Regions:
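N-terminal metal-binding scaffold of metallo-dependent hydrolase/deaminase domains
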Residues: 1-50, 60-61, 454, 460-462
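Alpha-helical scaffold segments that flank or form the walls of functional sites
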Residues: 36, 79-147, 173-187, 434-440, ...
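Histidine-centered catalytic micro-motifs
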Residues: 64-75, 221-230
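Active-site gating loops and adjacent loop-to-helix segments of metal-dependent hydrolytic enzymes
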Residues: 76-107, 158-171, 230-255, 277-280, ...
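Active-site glycine- and acidic-residue-rich loops that bind
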Residues: 128-132, 194-210, 289-290, 360-362
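Metal-coordinating catalytic core of metallo-dependent amide/deamination hydrolases
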Residues: 137-264, 269
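His/Asp/Glu-enriched, well-ordered alpha-helical/loop segment
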Residues: 250-257, 299-385
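C-terminal cap of metal-dependent C-N hydrolases
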Residues: 375-425
Length: 462
């Protein structure tokens, strides 16, 4: 059976059982298995036993990708980064996000969520500097599309006010901002709250300690960019005599309540500090390729027990492109010099892209794996493509040969949200056509500076 309305009608039922050729379980690919979903929840995954299951010959069911690090306010600037030197956030992202209004924040987020779901993502971990009005707009976009969202609000002690002046928040103001964000996230079961500290230098030591403790007390994640670029490392060493992860360990804020983003420029000692404190990180391979200074040692993380997920950092919303990059980056930077051809043996990356990201984001108790009792977030993937046939090793093929156009259905909380590449419950074509002008406008904020400029500027004259 190929893609059909019959499949879609079954996915829309409150209870359904599917029997594909392959189910990607936490223990690897399984054949002869079925999955039952009832009222949003997976109630059974195991050997086929139901006479009423829908046979899906030529299909695989896999966990939805979870993007462990992205920025929903940067959607329309992604192609501006071509050739740009690092610390793009100073020249492109900060001006773009500072110019967002509730309307443009909503459009930017909804556009990203559509891209992400088409790319196989069922959940995004958003890092934002948004205050309440912009986050409300982002949450509205999440509700309209059906995506799962780890929402965030930047709670920086040192910040720039609306007049462009440096300002400082009091401890009371910071506590009130945390509570306000929590209350906003309570409005939807598919929105999970988190808090951001843009970096170690946007909060004092005391503020970081207080913020860390608040997140522990509230049971939410504190997201921090860490060890991403050379200037950040040098600044931390100059100011504190320590590298960023060493500094955070010294003030006692490392732990599983944190989610550190990038961690590319790390020493062996810093890896050990992450491992000893059970601090998870996001591994962003495409960001390293396109705009980074280094590649995170993800295989070293794995070997030393550092939990990590895979993030896009607003490079590409194609889950397969990020999955392939995750393996390729490790193969080239860490495995090729020592003649290691396994480079994680494929399963490392399929696991990191789903359950690994869920663990890093602190949501593995509800999503990230195809297990009974978890919410039904999964992809229906067409296996009958020449690029993937004949099949000998599903996970290697999934990492290296599968493509976004093989995703026939995206299911979140047991409900189809994308089918055949199109949104199920809203008109995505009309949305794009109506808002393409806004997309160009957002990417043309007056303070944006491109150092490299368009590709055509560098083409030799003929």
């Amino acid at each position: 059976m190929r893609l059909s309305e019959h499949i879609l009608s079954n996915l829309k039922k409150p209870k359904f059982t599917l029997k594909p050729d392959v189910i990607l379980s936490p223990g690897g690919p399984k054949t002869g298995y079925e999955i039952t979903v009832e009222d949003r929840i997976i109630t059974y995954v195991g050997p086929a036993q139901s006479s009423g299951s829908l046979a899906l010959t030529g299909y695989a069911i896999v966990p939805g990708f979870i993007d462990a690090h992205t920025h929903a306010g940067q959607t329309f600037g992604k192609s501006l980064i071509g050739g740009e030197p690092s610390q793009i956030w100073k020249r492109i992202w900060n001006p773009m996000e500072a110019a967002l209004t509730p309307d443009t924040a909503h459009i930017s987020a909804k556009w990203m969520f559509l891209e992400a779901m088409r790319g196989g993502y069922t959940c995004l971990v958003n890092f934002s500097t948004n205050q309440r009005d912009l986050n409300a707009a982002v949450h509205r976009a999440a509700g309209e599309t059906g995506i799962r969202l780890v929402s965030s609000s930047a709670v920086d002690e040192h910040y720039t006010d609306q007049e462009g002046k440096s300002a400082v928040r009091s401890p009371l103001e910071i506590a009130e901002m945390v509570e306000d964000h929590l209350s906003l996230c309570d409005e939807s079961t598919q929105i999970i709250p988190s808090i951001c500290s843009t970096s170690f230098h946007t909060n004092s030591e005391d503020a970081l300690i207080r913020l860390s403790q608040m997140c522990i007390d509230k049971g939410i994640k504190l997201q921090i960019h860490s060890n991403e670029h050379f200037p950040e490392i040098q600044d931390c060493v100059t100011r504190f005599g320590k590298r960023p992860i060493e500094f955070m360990a010294d003030i006692g804020i490392l732990g599983d309540h944190l989610l550190l983003h990038h961690a590319t420029l790390v020493t062996d000692r810093e890896i050990e500090l992450l491992s000893a404190s059970n601090t998870p990180v996001s591994y962003n391979p495409l960001a390293s390729i396109w705009k980074g200074n280094a590649v995170a040692p993800a295989l070293a993380f794995q070997q030393r027990g550092v939990k990590f997920g895979i993030g896009s950092d607003t490079t590409s919303a194609d889950g397969f492109k990020n999955l392939s990059a995750a393996e390729a980056c490790q193969r080239i930077t860490h495995c090729m010099p020592i003649d290691d051809f396994s480079a994680g043996a494929a399963w490392t990356w399929t696991s990191a892209a789903s359950n690994g990201s869920a663990v890093a984001a602190g949501i593995d108790g509800s999503v990230g794996s195809l297990l009974s009792g978890l919410e039904a977030d999964f992809l229906l993937v067409d296996m009958l493509r020449p690029e993937c046939m004949p099949s000998h090793d599903f996970e290697w093929e999934f990492v290296r040969y599968y493509n976004r156009d093989q995703i026939d259905a995206v299911v979140i909380s047991g409900e189809p949200v994308v089918f055949g590449g199109k949104a199920v419950n809203w008109d995505d074509e009309s949305f794009i056509n109506q808002n393409i002008g806004t997309a160009y406008s957002v990417a043309s904020a007056p303070e944006i500076i491109r150092v490299h400029g368009p590709s055509s500027d560098h083409r030799p004259s003929v």
